A protein has these predicted regions:
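Terminal, non-globular segments
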Residues: 1-168
Length: 168
């Protein structure tokens, strides 16, 4: 399980570091940005037999994401939990391999951005319009695929080499 926690911490740090070093703004988002923490939640999901531990990790990560990056209260916790529900449903029907894990990550990133947009719109916090949302969704796909593929390959190889089992 320590490998999974390290992966989540690295992803969380990447969210902050790359936002500082990759020039981007809401009007012109970069092709090399994604939400690494969400991708990590998708990639580690299948390593948990017991979803209770996964949900604890999700709640902690959502809280930290709210506090450190978005300065919102409960927004990311709710969004991360909804993404968990989506991943859980998809995992029941779609096996895990490099192609399907990328599909799940893309769907999770799309869900994150769309839910953020909808929730912020509901509370009249309009920071961008729907066409900008489309650009953000389109441009986040490339890095989502790259990071998911790298993460999945490394975790699969490392985790099964060391533990040869799932997290209990």
């Amino acid at each position: 399980m320590i490998i999974l926690i390290i992966h989540i911490v690295i992803s969380f740090i990447l969210d902050g570091l790359l936002s500082n070093y990759i020039s981007t703004n809401i009007i012109n988002p970069s092709y090399f940005r994604t939400i690494y923490s969400v991708v990590s939640l998708v990639v580690i999901f299948s390593y948990f037999d017991e979803h209770k531990k996964y949900i604890y990790i999700l709640l902690i990560l959502g809280s930290l994401f709210d506090i450190v990056y978005t300065n919102t209260f409960l927004l990311n916790i709710v969004i991360f939990f909804i993404i968990y529900l989506i991943i859980n449903i998809l995992n029941n029907y779609i096996p895990n391999n490099i192609l399907t894990i990328n599909l799940k990550s893309i769907l999770a990133i799309l869900a994150y951005h769309i839910l953020s947009f909808l929730i912020l719109s509901l509370v009249n916090y309009h920071t961008y319009n729907i066409s900008t949302l489309g650009i953000i969704l389109y441009r986040s796909i490339i890095m989502t695929i790259i990071y998911t593929s790298i993460s999945y390959s490394i975790l699969k190889k490392a985790y099964y080499k060391i533990y040869d089992k799932k997290v209990k």
